[in-house]
UniProtKB/Swiss-Prot annotation:
Protein name: Nonsense-mediated mRNA decay factor SMG8
Organism of derivation: Drosophila simulans (Fruit fly)
Job of this protein: Involved in nonsense-mediated decay (NMD) of mRNAs containing premature stop codons. Probable component of kinase complex containing nonC and recruited to stalled ribosomes.
The keyword Transcription is annotated on this UniProt entry: no
Ranges of Polar residues composition bias in the record: 628-650
Coiled-coil parts of chain: none
Keyword NAD: no
Biased composition (Acidic residues): 568-583
Keywords noted in UniProt: Nonsense-mediated mRNA decay
Chain segments carrying region Disordered: 560-597, 628-653
Family assignment from sequence similarity: Belongs to the SMG8 family.
GO biological process, one term: nuclear-transcribed mRNA catabolic process, nonsense-mediated decay
Length: 944
């Protein structure tokens, strides 16, 4: 026995206490105390002046009993998960379980379900239930607890308790399954600190809280007019809310000691007596033991008396007396139950009922292997926690609605087949549709399920091939259906090799489609391409049926091991010529290989625009007449011999071209080209020819094009390129740039050959230092995917008309790096990139030939035409060099940039300067003969 009360842990009741309780006969009122606590012992009995033993350890579901002799009330303290100490123990257990992640929602549901179970037990074995709240306001979550308890009682307990209680010692309460509709009381351990602790203020707070609680319990049908349908009962015209305003339940030890000292030294007056003098002598300083308080007046005395009477015990005993005198339900319900008033049992009968209810509601629930023949009770044990987690069901229902809405939004908007980008957009739209309904802890799992369902729907015959084209566009054809070639649905506008005809081209998926097949197809529709003769680049000619692409390892250095040495420069001396003739006799095999390499051109080109090529410009009509002035201007650009008294400034800007000896030319006819190499007939070059690729490997098809589209008279510098000849040019950007090149011809020192040939024409070249002024027209053409074409007058400037053409304009494009990509000036919401696609060259009518050797640097590769000997352009003709549409190295595709950085315009690639050269016209070389264009001595031309 502690102080003036007994305490024990149920069911271990001491014998002497059991005897005292038996003496009460049928006057035992059972009071249950539930609620929240913050102390270490999970004690909610401090307001009643009771504490558990010092060795007490709080546990979930443990019941501590208290009985004060001389009273008629037995207090049951229910330790539950709402106690901070017990919930802390549960958190520690969850943290120690490292295999299971901590889920706050599941943890909260578990806490609430266990508390509802203890609340159900208290409501069935107690006459009065005191809910302890350590806050200052009513906890609205308690309404949820009451609703769940009422649901569990009506839907589960009432289905099996009446039948199961009939077979137990608790048969007396089998019909109603409880002692009565328990009266619910509310104890608030703390009082608002900003309110005065007077009788009026405390009573006002209690009355306001009672009105609030009564309204809430009535609104949610916790309290009804019928005792059988009510979970709890509220007293009529009697206080059921108590605020602990005067007692410090968990006070400070130091402050309590000071208060005790103050009470000991309290005196009703300030008079000093003899015994006071003895105390004053022991005081450490003057005034130490003076009275702390002033005399108490009558009103203050009333407040002190109210504080003594305003206790929880007195508050509880008033309701206990109602139970003892039989007016417990008086005024609480308008409709009384037919079973009669509540029951007061003796201690033995109550213990039998308590043992039965505790076993049915608490003990059996902890045993997962418990067997019972009652199906309703079996469902209660199995589904109790799941049935109480109504939020989980609610969130699951919302997520299910959102899932249906999201799936419908995805399927309704999904086309027949679509790619990853469309799938992601549809999934994002479906997610937004889901979020209109679905939310809660299960939303993430539902979203994952939505993504899986949408993904399966996409893969069920609706997935696109999505192989990226060479322009980084995915294929739109179905993935699971066979198709001969890929199609991205993107259409580009491109121009043929000669530049006259534009056509629609599909997005290419391989190098052959990009650089060869389209131009071969559109050439059949162009009435100019089918007539012009094009330079035939060397390509792979297999000797076996199982030929394959050459393999390139990433770690293998790009070294040109198969490239032959550079051609040796010819000297003017006769001795060196004799040595070359000797080498010719000694190397017959080499000569044979060289002739084989030079015969790769199946369509010979004429050095002059003869009758065969005149067919290609038939039908131009008025355009030829309009270009007559340009023709006269170009014809006047022949060699102009000047006196040896040329100014020094002109001499510095001149290019020196050394004329070869006739003996040398004759020797060259026999020797042929000096750079012939053997080529593989079993392996081909998978990409384009570049500077470090093996000369023994040739591509399967040419990616470049070189065509003579007509005589130089086709172009008129006054009108530019006309639409009927070159279509798709932007206004003002259709002019070629004039380029004046000064040459000085240096004759051979040997005069024997010249003395034997005394012709009028030969006499013109006898003068050493003859000078020529060449006028070449050059155009760097760019083309965007919409078919817009324009010329550039500088690496960073688009030609805007004839006013942009100055004397040195052409030098800016031939002597500088020209960007491979440049923003198209066409007006469009999207910024299209134009690509350098053609180089226009109008050659002069002069005793020299123009040599072209373009080199395009893209990434780590520098791509070339692939010819060992650079092509020699015929005189007084209009030539067009078409560059590759797509560039590919040995085994790496070089995709065009998505956008161009203005600060780095050459990042996507550039055309190297110095692609033009000039060489003396060889009258002994007939370019109409197959292979002779490649037989010219390429090593002797002068680079402009």
């Amino acid at each position: 026995m502690l102080d003036d009360y007994y305490t024990w842990t149920y069911p271990d009741i001491p014998e002497n206490v059991a005897q005292e309780l038996l003496q009460l006969n049928g006057s035992l009122v059972v009071v249950g105390v539930v609620g929240r606590s913050d102390c270490d012992l999970a004690n909610k009995m401090l307001a009643f002046g009771m504490e558990p033993p010092d060795d007490h350890t709080p546990e979930d579901g443990q019941i501590q009993c208290y009985y004060k002799p001389g009273t008629f009330s037995l207090l049951l303290h229910f330790e539950s998960t709402y106690d901070a100490e017990i919930s802390g123990q549960m958190i520690d257990v969850c943290i120690e379980d490292v295999d299971t992640p901590f889920d706050i929602d599941s943890f909260f549901e578990r806490i609430r379900c266990r508390f509802v179970r203890m609340m159900l037990l208290a409501l069935h074995v107690c006459h009065i239930v005191v809910y302890v709240e350590n806050g200052l306001t009513f906890d609205p979550t308690l309404l949820t607890v009451f609703q769940l308890a009422k649901f569990a009682r009506e839907q589960h307990l009432m289905q099996f308790l009446p039948q199961m209680l009939r077979e137990t010692p608790a048969a007396r309460i089998s019909e109603r399954t409880r002692l009565c509709a328990p009266r619910i009381l509310f104890l608030f351990e703390n009082f608002p600190g900003d309110e005065p602790k007077t009788r009026e203020s405390v009573s006002t707070c209690e009355f306001q809280m009672e009105d609030c609680i009564y309204e809430l319990l009535g609104r949610y049908n916790i309290v009804t007019n019928s005792s059988s349908n009510s979970l709890v009962a509220l007293p009529n015209n009697k206080q059921f809310v108590f605020f602990n305003a005067h007692e410090e339940l968990r006070d400070d030890k130091l402050l309590k000691a000071i208060d005790c000292l103050n009470e000991t030294m309290y005196k009703p007056d300030l008079k000093e007596e003899e015994e006071d003098l003895e105390i004053l002598a022991m005081a450490p300083f003057d005034g130490f033991v003076k009275p702390f308080t002033m005399p108490v007046y009558e009103k203050e005395w009333e407040n002190l008396q109210y504080q003594e009477d305003h206790t929880v015990w007195n508050f509880l005993q008033r309701h206990v007396q109602d139970a003892l005198v039989g007016c417990f339900d008086a005024g609480s319900f308008k409709q009384h139950a037919q079973q009669g008033p509540f029951q007061l049992l003796n201690s033995q009968e109550w213990h039998d009922c308590m043992a039965t209810m505790h076993k049915l509601l608490v003990e059996n629930a902890k045993d997962p292997d418990h067997e019972t023949s009652n199906e309703e009770y079996k469902l209660f044990l199995k589904n109790f926690d799941e049935d109480l987690n109504y939020e989980k069901k609610f969130w699951a229902h919302l997520c299910e609605l959102g899932l249906k809405k999201g799936i419908a939004a995805y399927k309704n908007a999904a086309p027949a087949n679509y790619g990853t980008a469309t799938h992601r957009q549809l999934l994002a739209d479906a997610t937004l549709a889901f979020e209109e309904e679905g939310r809660g802890p299960q939303a993430q799992a539902a979203l994952a399920k939505l993504a899986a369902i949408c993904h399966n729907h996409w893969e069920d015959g609706r997935q696109q091939c999505e192989l990226l084209s060479l322009r980084s566009h995915p294929c739109t054809l179905p993935k699971n259906m066979p198709h001969e070639k890929h199609n991205s649905g993107v259409i580009h506008i491109s121009t043929c090799n000669c530049g006259r005809t534009q056509g629609r081209r599909e997005d290419p998926f391989n190098l052959r489609q990009a650089n060869y097949e389209f131009y071969e197809l559109i050439a059949q529709m162009c009435n100019l391409c089918v007539k012009v003769k094009q330079y035939q680049f060397p390509i792979f000619e297999p000797s076996v049926s199982d030929y394959r692409a050459a393999a390139f390892e990433a770690a293998f250095p790009l070294l040109n091991t198969g490239k032959s040495g550079a051609p040796q420069d010819e000297d003017a001396g006769e001795d060196e010529a004799e040595e070359e003739e000797g080498q010719e006799r000694e190397l017959p095999t080499k000569k044979k290989l060289q002739n084989t390499a030079s015969n790769c051109c199946s369509h010979p080109l004429s050095p002059t625009f003869g009758s065969d090529l005149n067919m290609s410009i038939a039908g131009f009509g008025a355009s030829l007449k309009e270009s007559q002035a340009s023709s006269e201007q170009l014809s006047n650009s022949e060699q102009n011999t000047t006196s040896s008294g040329t100014s020094s400034a002109d001499t510095e800007n001149e290019l020196v071209v050394e004329l070869q000896e006739p003996a040398k030319k004759e020797a060259r006819e026999d020797v042929g080209p000096t750079d012939a190499v053997s080529t593989s007939t079993t392996e081909y070059l998978p990409g384009l020819v570049h500077t470090v690729s093996n000369f023994g490997l040739l591509p399967l098809f040419p990616s470049w094009s070189l065509a003579c589209v007509g005589p130089s008279s086709i172009y008129s510098h006054n009108t530019g390129l006309q639409e009927h000849f070159q279509s798709g040019f932007l206004s003002g950007a259709n002019f070629l740039l004039p380029w004046d090149v000064q040459l000085r011809l240096v004759h051979a020192l040997k005069q024997q050959y010249q003395q034997q040939h005394h012709g009028k024409k030969q006499q013109r070249w006898k003068k050493q230092g003859d000078r020529l002024s060449l006028k070449i027209f050059v155009g760097m053409e760019y083309e965007c995917s919409r078919g817009h074409r324009f010329m550039m007058c500088a690496p960073d400037r688009v030609l805007r008309g004839g006013a942009d053409i100055e004397r040195d304009t052409c030098s800016k494009v031939v002597h500088n790096n020209m960007p491979l990509y440049y923003p198209c000036p066409c007006r469009s919401q999207r910024n299209f990139l134009a690509q350098l696609m053609r180089i226009h060259v109008v050659t002069p009518k002069a005793p020299v030939n123009i040599i072209v050797d373009p080199k395009v640097c893209v990434g780590r590769y520098t791509f070339t035409l692939g010819s060992i000997v650079p092509p020699r352009l015929s005189q007084s003709a209009y030539w067009i060099i078409r560059l590759p549409y797509v560039y590919q190295g040995d085994d790496v595709l070089i995709a065009p940039p998505d956008h161009l950085d203005p600060d780095y315009p050459l990042a996507g690639g550039y055309l190297l300067p110095g692609m033009f050269g000039v060489v003396e016209t060889d009258p002994t070389l007939d370019l109409n003969e197959p292979g002779m264009m490649g037989a010219s001595a390429a090593g002797n031309f002068t680079r402009i």
